[in-house]
Amino acid sequence: MQEIQPPEKRTTLPRKRILIVNCYFDDSRQPIRRTNKIPQAVGPIYLAGAFARDTCDVRCYTEVASGPLEDEGLLSWPDMLVLTGLTNGFDRMLHLTAYARSKNPKVIVVAGGPPVRALPLFSKKVFDYACLGDIEELCDVISEAFGPAYVAKRMLPRYDLAYWLGRIGYVETTRYCNFRCSFCALTAEGRSYQTYDLEHVRQQIMASGKRSRMFFLDNNFYGSDRNHFRARLGLINEMRGAGQFHHWGALVTNDFYRSNENLRLVREAGCELLFSGLESFDNDWLRSFNKLQNTSSPQVEMVTKSLNAGVVFAYGLMLDVTSRSISDLRRELDFITSTPEITIPSFITLSIPLLGTPYFYDCVEKDTLLPNTKLRDMDGTTVLQKPLDDIAEVVRFVDDLQSLKGFHSRVLKHAAGFARLYRSKLTKMQMVLALGSNLLTCAQPISTSFSGLGWLKTRPRPRTFVSSTEPLDHMYTPAFRVDSRFESYFKPTMVTDDIGQLHEDIIQSGLLEIHAPRQSVARA
């Protein structure tokens, strides 16, 4: 007689709750929600793809579109808090860590991104896991913290969690850049340009669902692999034919424009807009920052070539008050706004000596950093270094830049001239994309925020636009009661001390050994 075996005992794994946050300080230093900002942050949805759906409940939050995270209920919810963000958002990571640990002492805090990679020792002291590698490192963290069953078998972006994206999809087809500009955080990290397998790109596009427009978030969509570039265009044509999206845009370096064939190929593939880091119309300044790819052809010629080919040319302008006079910078802005043949910059930023970059070390060597500069001040709207001109004149100039004050009539005249020149060569949407940036710049910060008017009533102190005296954001005051052991988490991370030398926060952070070999994940 066959022996009857007892039924197999099944074990159900407990579900883990994961909160992933893109940490952000707004340039206005107010709690503004940038719901209209393009591009939006997508780091959280890429990180969310590391968690297994059948064992993890994942929520994403971006402080860019939703404002500062101060919801006690949400911050007490997760078993694991995953934090990412830009370099100057490091202190927000500390704030959210303090909030979450005050609500749940057992919460596991994981942090990564540029600030963590720049400050590895500092990060190891405050986070349970300081991830110093690519986003795939999170899979190793999950496996160690919870077990392999909580790791997704295939890591794809969780577009279903991206409540803030709207009709625009975001996909990455390559990683890093093949150039080494001295002010770029990618140069500081020294990582090589990488291409993705086309099947992985296809899977991302399919996972995003059908969108009216797709934006490719590569650091350099053109890159150094010409065959892969053409293959991606072939895939784009295939996906457009299947109705996944209709039009698209991307970020490219200026060497893309050396070949007229490139413009023809992207236009035939449905490209509406390309963003390129033009930075300046001053070739001497570009050479000083190793931005050599921008000096091979005249900037105006490059912009007009793109527009005449039916592709909007978008760019940012970097104004360096430490090496150029205010009168020189004003002349550059006068030139741009009086030249309707070109677009006006989508944004204007001051030069930023980001941690670990050649530019940062050059500033340290030349002793140009102002006293009491905070890491949070590295936002592109705050004077961090000793300027050529009188500081009062520089402050007035920087203040005016926030809305192009003094240039409004020139911008309107430029827009009218631009429309006359290109209305037969660009679609209506392209005209909106091209001219919208001009007019929206004049309306900052309201233009990219439905809650933009709120800051007019809540601003406690006026900005000084100088790092040494700039008031702290309200986020440095806890939004609710936190454990006293986290008091230091709400003090700003300092870059320089009161005499302008590197602060102990930086000296002890691991930054100065940034090029030394290190593990990809540092466990506290």
Tell me what each language-model feature is.
Residues P157-A314, L319, D334:
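Radical SAM [4Fe-4S] cluster-binding motif and immediate context
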Residues Q2-P14, Y24-D27, P31, L132-T173, ...:
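N-terminal [4Fe-4S]-dependent radical SAM core
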Residues R29-P44:
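Glycine- and acidic-residue-enriched helix-capping/strand-helix junction motifs
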Residues L47-K153, I352, G356:
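Glycine-rich beta-alpha loop elements in corrinoid/cobalamin-binding modules
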Residues D27-Q30, A118-L119, F179, S224-R226, ...:
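Flexible glycine/acidic-rich beta-alpha junction loops that bind and position SAM and/or redox cofactors
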Residues V82, C131, F215-L217, F275, ...:
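Conserved beta-strand positions in the central sheet of alpha/beta enzyme cores
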Residues M1-I20, I32, R53-T55, G73-M80, ...:
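Radical SAM enzyme core and accessory elements
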Residues P120-K125, N262, S323-S338:
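Catalytic cores of alpha/beta
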